[in-house]
Structure formats: C-alpha cells, structure tokens
C-alpha cells in the first residue's frame, strides 16, 4: 500500500487528485487542509488545522503528520505550496510529487518562463509600458505571478496604460491573442522523455479553470512546443502547459505548471492517469503509454 498525502486537499487540484486516485487498490489517500474545505466531504481520511505555509512551525507540523500516517508521497495541490515544498524537499520526510526546485521556480513566474524559452517562435511578443505606442494596441496584461485569471486586463487605448505605470516587474504585457485557448496535459518519464501529450479545448473558463473541456487532436505545431519545452526544462511526471492562437493562427505559450491541472480528468478518462503514474514513477516504476484510439 502506498500512503499518499494531498495538500491542500480542498483545491480544484486536490479534488482532481482524489478522483484520479480514489479507486486504485494500491493507494491509501489522506487529505490535509489548513482550513475547513470541501476536502472533508470527499476524503475518507481527512486532517484539518495545519498552519499555513507562512508559519514558522509549518514544516515541523507537516513532518509530524507524515510520520504519524506513514506517508510515502506528498502531492502539493496549489501553486504556492508547490514552490514552497520544492524549496524544502530535503526537509520532507517523504517523496514529493512535483518536479525539481528550478522547474517549479521557473513555472511560478510567467516572466521567468518566457526568459528561459526566449527566442522560441511560440513565445508571444512582450512589451514594457514605456515602449508601447498606439500602433501596438490592443495588448493584454496579466500578473507575472498569479492564478485564476485574477488581475488580467485588455489594453485598448493608451490611457489604459496609466494603471500599469511603474508595474513592469509585476505584470507581463504581451500581444493580444484573440484565438481559442487550449491546455496540453503532459507526462515525462524518469529518462526525460515526453510520454504523453493530450490536448483539450478550454471551451468555458471559470476563475482560471476550464469547466467545459473537450479533447482535440494534437496539431504538429503544438507537439513541437511540447517537445521543445520538455527539452529545455526538466520535468518529473505530470505537468501541463496552455496555448492560445494568435491573429495569424499560430499557437503561443501562455504558461506551464509542474502539477495536475484542475480539469485533467478530460484527458485522464482516455486511459492515462497522470498523477497515478507520477506516484508509481516516484516509487521506482518505469512508465510507458499505449496510444488510445478512442474516437473522441
């Protein structure tokens, strides 16, 4: 039996992890939350009341829970928690289900992501406030570090830039991408090989999560992006990235993350369980995938 701890278990990520692992007879799931959450409804084994990650006692409390419950693998289920724990992996009393600290640090910042992949054709053009002229408009601004579509804005006229003056370090201002948005769910094995890349259309989005998602065929252009990112950045197990079509019909990268996506179930039901295989990989198994020719 593999004892798996999920924190915070009440996030959309934590709920998808529960759905992905709850029927596996080799997995014993334990949900952990700092505050009362929906995790208490779905996790049979549920622990509540651990301090926030900003507390000086958090790691001590976490390791006690890990030891008391004989936890083998911890799955972080929130972006800030992922980065925090990746920086303290050596202090943890169990395995951590995410990529290395460098990858987590890059992924948490859209600016760092674009800098690492600078020069690639799929990186959108970005601007500083002082460089923007009327002919560049419309543009799009989003926080460098953020989630859930919080703080985004479309820049239609020069006056809109007044809200962003002095905030070049806080925001990414890029070309406007007017086309359809997609998520590509990926898995990288221990050899660094991209095993799976499954693309889905984000038809309806609520607080940054696709609540209506449809599998689509992976275009050659997007497969090139997946391979290029996987070649430049080191992943271990599950990860995903998001792309959007530009005005010329080419795919441009929005962001990436070394974790389960909230709507990854759409790809999971085709036959490849991303987080389950990540757990097995952490436990020493070599992971392969067989193409599922399901007519979606």
Task: Give the role of each language-model region.
Residues 1-98:
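ATP-binding N-terminal substructure of ATP-dependent carboxylate-amine bond-forming enzymes
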Residues 40-42, 58-60, 105-112, 151, ...:
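Short, charged, surface-exposed secondary-structure boundary motifs
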Residues 104-180, 189-193, 220:
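Active-site nucleotide/adenylate-binding loops and adjacent lid/helix of ATP-dependent enzymes
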Residues 139, 195, 252-255:
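Protein kinase-like catalytic core scaffold
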Residues 169, 174-234, 245, 257-284:
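ATP-dependent carboxylate/phosphate-activation module, predominantly the ATP-grasp catalytic core
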Residues 236-248:
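A short glycine-rich, hydrophobically flanked beta-strand micro-motif that places a catalytic Asp/Glu
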Residues 286-296:
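Cysteine/selenocysteine-centered motifs that mediate thiol-based redox chemistry or coordinate metal-sulfur cofactors
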